[in-house]
Amino acid sequence: MTTLSCKVTSVEAITDTVYRVRLVPDAAFSFRAGQYLMVVMDERDKRPFSMASTPDEKGFIELHIGASELNLYAMAVMDRILKDREIVVDIPHGDAWLRDDEERPLILIAGGTGFSYVRSILLTALARNPARDVTIYWGGREEKHLYDLSELEALSVNHPNLRIEPVVEQPEEGWRGRTGTVLTAVLQDYGTLAGHDIYIAGRFEMAKIARDLFCHERNAREDRLFGDAFAFI
C-alpha cells in the first residue's frame, strides 16, 4: 500500500451530479485494472473510489465521482478537491481486478458511476487483446446518467467485438436503448454464462442478486464472478 499526495489538475462537471477528476500523484504508483483508491479525509476516515484510468496511464489517475445533496459522503470529498486542489490517497485496494486469462469472453456490468470500475477493465482488456469479446451493460435512472456513452460507442467502431448495451430505468421519448435493469437485460441475452468472466460494479444488494441469479439460473461460475461487493457479502 502506498500513500500519495495528489495535485488536482482538472475537475469536469459531466452532469449535474457527476464529476470527472484528474489527479497527478507526487510519486510513482501502480495498480491493477479494476482496483480502487481510498481518499484520506483524516486518519480514521478513508473513502473508496474506483480508478477509471488504466494502469498503463502512468502520469495521472482519473476518478468519476457522483456527488450531490443525496450523497454527502462523496460531496465532502468533492468539497475538499475543489477547495484545496490537493488530496491524499492510499493506493491500491481491492481484489476484483482484471484477471490475466485473455481468451474468455467478458461481461462488464455497471450502474451509474460504477462505470469507472468497468472502464479501466474494458480499456485494459482491449489493449491486451483487441479481438476479445466484450459486452458492457451500463444502467442508469435516466439517459443523462450514462455520461460517457458516446466514448463507448466510438470505441466500438474500432472494436466490432465490443457490444454496448445501455439500459435506462426511466426513458425519455426517443430513447433507443434498453429499458429496465441491467440484470434483467443480461438474463434476457444469455441462456448460459458458464463460459464468461463477469465483472460487476454496483450496490451490495445488486451484486448479491446478480450472484444468485447468474449462478443458479445461468450456470455462471462463482470463481469467475468479480466485484468489490463480493468481499463483503
Swiss-Prot record:
The lineage of its organism: Bacteria, Pseudomonadati, Pseudomonadota, Gammaproteobacteria, Enterobacterales. Belongs to the Fre/LuxG FAD/NAD(P) flavoprotein oxidoreductase family. NCBIfam families: PRK08051.1. One of its GO terms (biological process) is iron ion transport. Monomer. This is NAD(P)H-flavin reductase. It catalyses: reduced riboflavin + NADP(+) = riboflavin + NADPH + 2 H(+); reduced riboflavin + NAD(+) = riboflavin + NADH + 2 H(+). Pyridine binds at residues 111-115.
